[in-house]
A protein has these predicted regions:
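Positively charged, solvent-exposed patches that mediate nucleic-acid binding
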Residues: 1-116
């Protein structure tokens, strides 16, 4: 499960304290916080990306990828965005790019032997 970010102060913290990564058309800023269980996530898709249907398609894709991989994400606050190219990316590649970005910022949880 993923929760939304509703607190405005958190967005200021992304600029100050967030770790950032970019993989292809996807970018991610993360503040790892053990108290943020389940992970909190917001999506930022600017108007320059395209029309509202394109932006919504990207947002839905990001949300689906985040839900599918929520168990691999460290507790924390996530701000995720993407370029227009992300809307045309196959789902498997979109998942891979999401996980690569999370790995770059140190937000992936490695499964323990007991969990396998």
């Amino acid at each position: 499960m993923i929760w939304r970010i509703r607190n405005r102060a958190v967005f200021g913290r992304f600029r100050r304290d967030g770790r950032r990564a970019r993989v292809g058309p996807l970018w991610m800023s993360v503040i790892v916080d053990p108290a943020a269980v389940p992970p909190r996530m917001a999506f930022s898709i600017g108007r320059t990306v395209g029309s509202a249907p394109v932006r919504n398609r990207i947002r839905r894709r990001l949300r689906a990828v985040a839900r599918a991989r929520a168990d691999q994400l460290a507790p924390g606050w996530y701000l995720v965005g993407a370029d227009a190219e992300y809307a045309r990316t196959p789902f498997a590649l979109a998942e891979e790019q999401f996980l690569q970005a999370a790995e770059k910022v140190g937000a992936l949880v490695t499964p323990t032997l007991e969990a396998r």
